[in-house]
Design a protein with these regions (language model features):
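Catalytic cores of nucleic-acid endonucleases
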Residues: 68, 92-136
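A generic structural signal for short hydrophobic patches within well-formed alpha-helices
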Residues: 35, 138-139
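Structural motif
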Residues: 84-86, 113
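Short, charged low-complexity intrinsically disordered segments located at boundaries
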Residues: 28-31, 87-89, 135-137
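Accessory nucleic acid-recognition modules appended to NTPase machines
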Residues: 1-84
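Short, glycine/charged-rich beta-strand-loop motifs at protein surfaces that mediate ligand recognition
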Residues: 43-44, 89-92
């Protein structure tokens, strides 16, 4: 299916070791309608759809996109275009008293933009200095 251009395989990148991790890629679909047609159900995980949408938007903006790994934490996206590097976490919503999305950023190298993208307007704001942006604001 990858050769049919239905999916993008995104490599995992070890941020600390600055190397690609073999065999640990993550897949994103070119068209979410394809997944829905194959699964024949309407309730595809919203978090997956939002993450897939952010991935496609980053590609359209000319970023090279990786899935980041730092120690045992996953960073949804490391997006790089020339010298511009962004660390991005994507979530449908941030549960109360849950710091998983921001904790993944705590030990990352400084100097690069960090951002959490959410589908919940109530989450928009700032968590420990990290901007939390609504998906619509990210897309425009």
């Amino acid at each position: 299916m990858h050769n049919a251009f239905l999916f993008y395989k995104v490599p995992r990148f070890d941020i600390r070791g600055k190397e690609y991790l073999r065999g640990q890629g993550k897949y994103y679909v070119v068209d979410l309608g394809f997944i829905r047609s194959q699964l024949q159900r309407k309730n595809i995980n919203r978090g997956f759809k939002i993450e897939n949408l952010v991935f496609l938007e980053l590609l359209s903006r000319g970023y090279e996109v990786f899935v980041g790994k730092y120690n045992d934490k996953e960073i949804d996206f490391v997006a790089q275009k020339d010298e511009d590097v962004k660390y991005i976490q994507v979530t449908d919503h941030i549960p109360e008293n849950n710091t998983r999305e921001s904790d993944n950023f705590l030990h990352l190298p400084t100097g690069y933009q960090k951002m959490i993208i959410t589908n919940n307007w109530d989450d928009v704001g700032n968590i420990e200095g990290i901007p939390v942006v609504h998906i619509i604001d990210f897309l425009i």
